[in-house]
């Protein structure tokens, strides 16, 4: 039987989809990239925003219309957070939340043996769950390996549905992490990206820390780069930064979710830091990592956000000189405190603020890439995407292109030093230089 996966949302979802693919393959299924050829179609959903829900509904209808006889499985955050709404979707045969996904093949078989009567399997979180270790499975053409090591969130920001969809914080045990990373290294991966719903809370249950995971990965033979996913600012201490700076394999790319550059809005969001604390953290990072990238998420249109609040947020974002900003509109999530507020912002105002913040984001991105001109940096090359260039990324995840020779040889999974000579709004351009001539901390 053939199985097709459609994934929405974050890198954690992508990791989980890879795990589910491995589980179905072990059960005798073949993974297909053609939904019309699938016997089972699985949608791994996201529900961070209403637009994500809308895209999921559209995809569900389209996939059902294209393959009426397939078993349609809806899983992930939307199913867990809104089980009644998910179960009411006529296109969905089997609805399963964010737990027990290792049982999916058995649940599909149970559905088929039960006269294809619609099924729902969404156990509630109790707060005592252990970390679910799904097997890893990556396409052979991938350069970096993404590994989910943490799940759940204890923060309950006023706008966020994720604690309800994912349960409380829990972490992959270190012995399991060692096995996973060693296996990736044996498969030829030189870069590991550690992911989680609230990654900076890794190890909190047993008194450990994210540093434990990063150090373990850096010490694994064959692993040359260790990168982190999104981080909560309040968990990043100076001691942690000092320890990370002492690890040569650590990649200085920090995605620190800001959400707003206005202190009043941050307080209303139930965020646990001020703009002053956030700015101090960024300064501490830059003092330890002279060549680094700090990226962020910024929400516009949170309930009660005034024009003055937004102007403050815009000005703060500009002052931080981010490498990249992901801008998104607030959307009410049923069951969260912010959704109950009477001072919701109109769609037209959200749109205006979105445009203004995106313009700033584009300017900041172009300026960041331009700041790399003159640097010589190690670049891990990836799958060739066009005939004219080799493509790769620096440790701080700056995208780099170098011209390809006429008789193009693949550089994939190799690291070379590149002198950055030009940039545009999307990437940097340069040429390979001998390692002996490389100096990544100074411009020539």
Task: List where the protein language model places each region.
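Residue-level signal for inorganic ion chemistry
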Residues: 42, 77, 104, 194, ...
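Contiguous mid-protein beta-loop-alpha structural module that forms a pocket-lining wall or clamp
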Residues: 305, 321-322
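Acidic, glycine-rich loop-and-beta core segments that form the ion-binding/anion-interacting portion
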Residues: 209-261, 267, 272-279
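Short glycine/threonine-rich loop-to-helix capping motif typified by GTGT followed
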Residues: 203-208, 241, 304-312, 341
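Terminal RNA-binding accessory module
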Residues: 340-444
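Proteins enriched for Cys/Gly/acidic motifs involved in redox and nucleic-acid/cofactor modification
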Residues: 1-201, 215, 239, 244, ...
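Conserved strand-turn element in the central/C-terminal portion of the radical SAM core barrel
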Residues: 156, 160-167, 199, 226-234, ...
């Amino acid at each position: 039987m053939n199985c097709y996966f459609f994934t929405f949302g974050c890198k954690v979802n992508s990791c989980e989809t890879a795990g589910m693919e491995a589980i179905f393959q072990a059960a005798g299924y073949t993974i297909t990239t053609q939904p019309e050829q699938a016997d089972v179609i699985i949608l791994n959903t996201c529900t961070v925003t209403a637009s994500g829900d809308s895209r999921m509904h559209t995809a569900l209808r389209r996939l059902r219309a294209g393959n009426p006889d397939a078993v349609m499985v809806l899983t992930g955050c939307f199913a867990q957070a809104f089980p009644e709404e998910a179960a009411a979707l006529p296109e969905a045969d089997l609805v399963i939340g964010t737990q027990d996904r290792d049982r999916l093949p058995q649940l599909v078989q149970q559905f088929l043996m039960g006269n294809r009567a619609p099924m729902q399997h969404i156990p509630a979180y109790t707060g005592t769950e252990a970390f679910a270790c799904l097997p890893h499975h990556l396409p052979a053409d991938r350069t970096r390996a993404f590994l989910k090591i943490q799940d759940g969130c204890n923060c309950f920001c006023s706008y966020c549905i994720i604690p309800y969809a994912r349960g409380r914080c829990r972490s992959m045990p270190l012995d399991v992490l060692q096995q996973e990373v060693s296996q990736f290294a044996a498969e030829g991966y030189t870069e590991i990206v550690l992911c989680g719903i609230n990654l900076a809370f890794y190890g909190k249950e047993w008194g450990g820390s994210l540093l434990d995971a990063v150090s373990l990965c850096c010490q694994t033979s064959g692993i040359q780069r260790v990168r982190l996913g999104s981080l909560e600012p309040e968990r990043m201490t100076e001691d942690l930064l000092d320890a990370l700076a002492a690890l040569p394999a650590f990649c200085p790319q920090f995605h620190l979710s800001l959400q707003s550059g206005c202190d009043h809005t941050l307080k209303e969001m139930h965020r646990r830091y001020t703009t002053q604390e956030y700015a101090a953290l960024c300064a501490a990072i830059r003092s330890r990592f002279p060549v680094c990238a700090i990226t962020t998420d910024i929400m516009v249109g949170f309930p009660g956000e005034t024009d003055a609040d937004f102007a403050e947020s815009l000005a703060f974002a500009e002052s931080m000189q981010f490498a990249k900003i992901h801008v998104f509109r607030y959307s009410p999530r049923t069951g969260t405190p912010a959704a109950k507020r009477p001072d919701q912002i109109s769609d037209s105002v959200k749109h205006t603020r979105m445009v203004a913040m995106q313009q700033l984001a584009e300017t900041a991105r172009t300026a960041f890439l331009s700041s790399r001109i003159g640097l010589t940096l190690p670049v891990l090359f990836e799958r060739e995407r066009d005939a004219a260039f080799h493509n790769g990324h620096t440790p701080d995840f700056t995208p780099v292109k170098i011209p390809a020779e006429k008789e193009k040889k693949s550089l994939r999974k190799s690291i070379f030093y590149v002198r950055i000579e030009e940039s545009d709004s999307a990437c940097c351009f340069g040429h390979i230089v001998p390692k002996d001539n490389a100096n990544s901390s100074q411009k020539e």
